[in-house]
Amino acid sequence: MKPGASSRRTIREAGATPQAPIQFEFDAGAGRHRVWGTAFVSQEGLAVNLVGGDVPHIGAVAISIPRPSRADARRRSATTSVFALPGHKEDELARPFAASLAQALGRTTVVVAGVHIRRAGPADIAKVFENAGRAVEAIIARLKAPPRDRDWRVAVDGFAVSVVRTPSRRGRKRS
């Protein structure tokens, strides 16, 4: 190697081909308590947009980075930071959602959350959290599935994830 040259090789130089990004949609629940969104998976991590209720919006953003647990290095934990817009409480949804995904998948995870239900009571909030939990389970199941099974729908307790693959650049005609 020449002096000053980097010893790091790109994926293509190492002879590997990068995994194509995957994008899919999810939803859980019904009516006012329904949550839905999209997940975008790349080699660098996972980005999830989670919205729902009467007024879908951006209320909070969480980023979670997986790391070894301080209590038991054989287990995975996550460090999570959250930014909530003034007057919004979606940080309570975005933080555990991002942390659960990062811990289970070992990927840096960003979650943008915005769920608003007009005149919501404690039961409404509990139902939204339950549906978000189902969404987490389905996303984890989808991404832990063997590659050959990823083109199939994944059902978790009657909850389905629809898969939409990001188009490959190969085979496209240039205009």
Q: What do the predicted segments below correspond to?
A:
Residues 2-8, 165-175:
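Short Lys/Arg-rich cationic patches that frequently serve as NLS/NoLS or arginine-rich RNA/DNA-binding motifs
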Residues 25-104, 108-117, 122-146, 163-171:
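Conserved mixed alpha/beta catalytic, RNA-binding, or beta-rich assembly cores of soluble enzyme
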Residues 141-157:
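Short, Lys/Arg-rich amphipathic alpha-helical interaction segments
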